[in-house]
Amino acid sequence: MRIDYSEQMVTWEWDGCVIKIELPDIIHAEYNKNENIVIVYSGENFVSKIIFYFSLEGKLLGQQNLPEGTVDWNHNGQHQIVFHHLHHLRFSPKYQRIFSIFRSSSDFGLPSELEIYNLEGEKIDQIESPAGFTMLYISEISKKKLRIVCEALKDDCFDKSGRSDFYFNLDLE
């Protein structure tokens, strides 16, 4: 799907209609084919401050305010979650989940944890990083699993080829 955007407008075609949405300070816009949504990044000097999530019909599904550490969405009413020391967030309307990777402080040497919320705003799971590693970001979401990129916190956790990163597969069922 082709997405066109300028500093103040994002447009795309869906089901024979042209969808036009005005937003301030657009940095980038993209179609996420796995979620079947349009994601728009807004901010200043190429630094994102707000990420907007739209349905293909142009309906605002949710938005993430990066400086404030919040995500807001509408699902059977308005919801908001405030995150402290958030490192990575994935908003997944397709699987009706919000996945957040966070740390207990701003120290990047500490292992991160994953929290999973449903769209009612209820925390449904919390998972620690594998021993000796920290979770960096979610690379893939499916109905059955998450694929998370992890990084070693210490040299003794590197593999025999000297790699510090690996994929951690987390079963969701």
Model regions and ranges:
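Aromatic (tryptophan-biased) beta-strands that constitute blades/sheets of beta-rich domains
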Residues: V10-W12, C17-L23, G62, P67-F83, ...
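Beta-strand C-termini and the immediately following turn/loop, strongest in propeller blades
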Residues: R2-S6, Y41-E44, S100-P111, I148-F158
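Charged linear interaction tracts used for macromolecular binding and regulation
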Residues: Q80-S105, L110-E113, Y117
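Acidic (E/D-rich), amphipathic helical modules within compact regulatory domains
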Residues: G58-Q64, I98-S100
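Repeated scaffold domains used in trafficking and secretory/extracellular systems
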Residues: M1-Q8, K20-G43, K49, Q80-Y95, ...
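Structural motif
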Residues: F46-L61, T70-D72, S106-E115, D156-F168
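Acidic, proline/glycine-rich low-complexity IDRs
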Residues: D125-S129, F133-E173
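Short, ordered coil/turn segments that flank beta-strands lining enzyme active or ligand-binding pockets
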Residues: L56, L119-E120, E173
